[in-house]
Amino acid sequence: MDRRSWPWKKKASDKSILVIDSAADASHSQIDKEAIKKPKYVQISVEQYTHFTGLEEQIKSYDVQIKGYDVQVKTYENQVESYEEQVKDFEEQIDAYDEKVHEYEEQVQKLNEDVEDLNEKLSVANEEIVTKEALVKQHSKVAEDAVSGWEKADAEALALKNTLESVTLSKLTAEDRAAHLDGALKECMRQIRNLKKDHEVKLHDVALSKTKQIEKMTMEFEKRMCDYEQELLRSAADSDALSRTLQERSNMLVKVSEEKSRADAEIETLKSNLEMCEREIKSLKYEVHVVSKELEIRNEEKNMCIRSAESANKQHLEGVKKIAKLEAECQRLRSLVRKKLPGPAALAQMKLEVENLGRDSGDARQKRSPVKVSSPCKSPGGYSSTGSEFSLDNAQKFQKENEFLTERLLAMEEETKMLKEALAKRNSELLESRNLCAQSTSKLQSLEAQLQQNNSQKSSLEVCPNLNTSNPSSSISVSEDGNDDSGSCSGSLSTNPSQQIKKEKDMAALERVESVNSHVELMDDFLEMEKLACLPNLSSSNGSIDSKDGSGDQKSEMVILDAHTDLEDSDRGSPAVMKFRSRLSKVLESVSPDADIQKIVGDIKCILQDVNACMDQEKPSEVHVHPEEVSDLCPEQNLVEDCHLAEQKLQSIHQDLKNAVSRIHDFVLLLRNEVKAGQDTSIEGNDFVELIEGFSVTFNHVLSGDKSLDDFVSNLANVFNEAMERKVSFRGLASSEVETLSPDCIDKVALPESKVVDKDSSQEIYQNGCVHNEPGVPCDENRVSGYESDSKLQEIEELRSEKEKMAVDIEGLKCQLQESEQLLADIRSQFDSAQRSNRLADTQLRCMTESYRSLESRAADLEIDVNQLKEKIQKLENELEDEKCNHQEAILRCHELEEHIQRHRNTSLVAEDDEEADIKSKQERELSAAAEKLAECQETIFVLGKQLKSFRPQPEQMRSPQTRNESYSEEEELGTTTTSVPKNYAVVDEGDSVNEVPRFMESPKCPSDSETSDTTTSPSRVGSRLSRSGSSTNATPEKASRGISRFFSSKSGY
């Protein structure tokens, strides 16, 4: 192609280079100023911000709950300390009772010593009596000797008279001594009687006071035991609630840790993707650099073509001038020839001149020919063989590169879609986990409220007098499933891009969550029923042996009805629950006052087991039991084992109580036998025996379970009160009359001078060998001695009976002390268990705090990672901005080149001919095609920039659908004009990245592409451009994918 019409291009190109350099410097200074002015912020999405705020609020709530648990633990410790102080007070009271018992034993020992002294005195008196009898015998022998030897001597008679007088004197003295001894004995007897009366009164008062104190102590012990049992039950319920909350928290922590591990894995994948993106960005940068180099080479080729065209034009002008000169000379020669013919010499000279001119022109042609051959515009088509081959190879390479880049861009778009879907799933899972946490907290609050209501109902029931009787100690142990399948909501990262499948999965996950929540609520209601059944039963288990009391039946019916109402409110949808409800209603309708509660409880257990089996069969695919959840079930199995151990303990206690009751019954039967064997005139034995027989009937009823221990104790108290009123005493196997002696008997003992004597006693006295020579005095002496011995024996027997009574009382007190010690041991064991539970709660709270700290540290690490990723993204954005700036500079240079070309066109229109006008039109077409290709290159580069931008985090707010549609319509309109109007070349604004829409909503072109560079072009030039480039307005979107290949394939035409 001939380029002779551009002789002025060289100076204009020099000027354009200077203008481009100045514009580039100005643009760099403006960009640096804008970069200095614009603050750099870290972009965080709204969902991430809300997620971080939610985590902070959860941590604060967990801190508040931990503080509440600390306060509860402190209250438990204070209660334990108060219990220990009460136990110490009980031990001090027991020590005081032991001291009193020791005092009573000392008093008994003193009384025994007094009895021994009296026995010694009686033994001395007996010895004196024996000596006196020996003397009487000797005197009788002497009298016989005197009667036999009366005839021997009168002197002996006088001597005997003297001896008789001395004997009478000794008798008088002995009688005086006996009188003195009788007075002393009377005084001793009076003192003994007074002591007996005082001791009897004191013992009676002491026994009454002790019985009253013991009754008070027993009542206080029972009340305190009931209070302690209630407090222990409350503490057990609180510990169960705490253990459940801790288990739920541990499950939540495990889930959070799993989610964090998954998030870490996702972050690692994102990091790897970012690294890949960085590599791709580097490769794209390299490709852009290569393209820029090629553009520079093409620009240099353009300049060379322009220079060659200018030189060709100059040579052409010179040739024209020479031709003109030759024509002038030819005309001159013709005129000379016409005037006159030249001679031979003139012809030879003309030949030489013509040959010289031909040589000069041939040399000039030979000089011009290599330039024309080397130029790409020599042939009429405008292409040379080497240039065409080079352009085709480059076009094929660029097409392949474009296809590879498009494939990579599509892969990157798919990966970003996958990541967005995964992030959306994560957000939904986090929302679901938060909802589950809220539901669990609400359930815990409702459980606490229900426990408080149950405690208030229990206190109100205990106030009622009809409900003070015993209840059966039955405990319903229901194995809770505990399968909190909130973790099943979290699916795998592999997602389907279609939205319908995603919606279906979300609906299935919601259905699973609802089903699992209903199942968990059902199990919680069962546990509440178990608690309600255990609380009143355990509070009254110490006062009952078997489980067939009427009031116990009423209480159990009330508890089961409350549980039934709770179950009716818990779940109303599943068929298993409806079946369970019908079965439970049948069982409750079949309950009667005479029914066995243990049987009812067994039926309820069977129903619960069937319901658990049905729930497991109905949802085998939805409820997945993981090993971690199985390990979470272990505390509930321990609770069941503890319930079984408690039942065994209660059974052993019931057996011990049965043995004690049978011993008491045997004692009362022995008392009845003694009363029947030794009935006295002062006792109405028949009524007392009938009372004992009624007591034995109640004993049989208690053993059979028809009556409770309260009736047994009341009947036993009636028997003892009757025995105390009738003054019945138990002395082993022999009854005494010490306490029922009449005043006549006391007078008989007190007055030995009375002459009313029974025949049996007189015969016993005469059997001792008394001779009735002088019947008056010896008979009276024997009678007095018999009465004294009988009275002493009776006193000894009375003292022995009193001693035995004291021993029995002491044994009873010892038994009571043993019972109190057993109660104290039980209380201590209960305190130890409470302390252990408190220690477990402390350890669990410490574990919770440590886990919270680890979570905080992990959250800090994640924040650090996020900040690092944000920094990387900012770096990538800065690099993209630099590339945009470079692109804008290239666009400005292209605009300047176009302006120069337009100027050359305007100047060349005046001087060119028709052929040159055709050439110019061709050149203008080629330039317009180049401009179109440049626009397509700009579009592809801008699309690449957008795709690089999409690797940044999502914006905080999405644009509304109206704005999206408007932007999309504007982009379509602008897309039709970018190929024709050079002012539509994209100048990307950094402010557009804030309100960026997702890639799947973007159009191939951005509204920011409509920004123009009107500062460098005038309206007339724009109009001329629009008029000339009207043929290119019908560009299709396929040019965006094949723009680079067309541009580089058409460059060879220059």
Curated annotation (Swiss-Prot):
Coiled coil start-end: 64-139, 174-200, 250-341, 389-463, 637-666, 788-944
Ranges of biased composition (kind: Low complexity): 371-380, 450-461, 470-494, 1007-1032
InterPro entries, per database record: FPP_plant
Domain of life: Eukaryota
Region spans: Disordered: 359-390, 448-506, 951-1054
Entry keywords, A to Z: Coiled coil
Family listed: Belongs to the FPP family.
Subunit structure: Interacts with WPP/MAF proteins.
Protein name per the record: Filament-like plant protein 6
Organism the protein comes from: Arabidopsis thaliana
Lineage: Eukaryota, Viridiplantae, Streptophyta, Embryophyta, Tracheophyta
